[in-house]
Amino acid sequence: MVAIKRLATVDADFKAQMDALLAFEAAQDEGIERTVIGILADVKARGDAAVVEYSNKFDRLTASSMADLELSKAEMQKALDGLPADQRQALEAAAHRVRVYHEKQRMEGWSYTEADGTMLGQMITPLDRVGLYVPGGKAAYPSSVLMNAIPAKVAGVKELIMVVPTPGGEHNQLVLAAACLAGVDRVFTIGGAQAVGALAYGTEAVPQVDKIVGPGNAYVACAKRRVFGIVGIDMIAGPSEILVVADGSSDPDWVAMDLFSQAEHDELAQSILICTDAAYIDRVQASIEKLLPTMPRREVIETSLTNRGALILVRDLEEACAIANRVAPEHLELSLADPDPWVAKIHHAGAIFIGHYTSESLGDYCAGPNHVLPTSGSARFSSPLGVYDFQKRTSLIKVSKAGAQTLGKIASTLAHGEGLPAHAKSAEFRLEN
């Protein structure tokens, strides 16, 4: 029997139990940190030569130059053309839905003119160049290519450079096909901290980017943290999370499988059920026991559920929503008979999946909204990846001669108050009297 925690809000120590359940902090491995610092410094100093050397070492390659580590657009197109029909159709359908959704996020500029002729506004411009990191090998995720690349292209990013390691020289054709569909401009078959360094600093072959997005292992995450400030980054993602709020009206097998869908990612993933019905919680646990033996990744799922999962009994749905807001999960399912009135009660979640038929996996692949979501409670202050992450806002100020008289006096007074006389004079020189 899976030893998943059973909690109840009526328990005297419920708060302490919740604190323990949610206590997760990504470990900082000093060995990884030292390795990454060394690799980044080497790439910054030696450029292509360092990238080739590390790629050969870590990915078991025999590249002699960066020319051996760049794929052409023809190779991306070949990967797309070579897909089985069902895979190509699914990839194209997902790409279309992701593009349609994200086109609605595009920010537009605005301005207004005051009575004295002064114009104020905001201009929206895309980033010039973005780097997309994609994990390599057999476990590569083409859906991540679509979710990261399409919003960038919708935003108007001029050049999108993808880096993807190819251990043993193995190319994932689905990933390359997704890159082709999403409009990726260049692909380098490099990975790890050396790829992050190449994107952040630029080398002879790899242009420096303005922002790096995409998931990666501990070395990649560490490297992204280290180069932040030189370039922008999307986020440092923690383990996957799902929280299901249920009232007992949905098939318990569905809920159990939804919990599995995140637990199968890795042992640190977190799957939580919050329910108003104790008997239904029992049925979900029975479904877990029944379905787990059928899962190829059952050991990972069981470890995840045992270490970080929970089945929580609450008094009512108001209490369920309050707990959900405290958790601020990456994925939140409202598995309720009448879910719509409860959506407004949720203030903190990466994405909300509403109703019995909205499985979290649809959001992962093809519903349309982005699957790059805030984790580890950061949905309290963060948002999903979107077009706005690839656009910048620039303030516009055009002061008329009349406006300079009014604003100049205000600015002069405030500047003198702050002890900045040159600021004051800059405004005063434009005053008529």
Curated annotation (Swiss-Prot):
Any one GO biological process: L-histidine biosynthetic process
Domain of life: Bacteria
UniProt pathway: Amino-acid biosynthesis; L-histidine biosynthesis; L-histidine from 5-phospho-alpha-D-ribose 1-diphosphate: step 9/9
Known catalytic reactions: L-histidinol + 2 NAD(+) + H2O = L-histidine + 2 NADH + 3 H(+)
GO molecular function, one term: histidinol dehydrogenase activity
Sites where the protein binds substrate: 240, 262, 265, 331, 364, 418, 423
PROSITE patterns: HISOL_DEHYDROGENASE
CDD domains: Histidinol_dh
Cofactor: Zn(2+)
Function of the molecule: Catalyzes the sequential NAD-dependent oxidations of L-histidinol to L-histidinaldehyde and then to L-histidine.
Entry protein name: Histidinol dehydrogenase
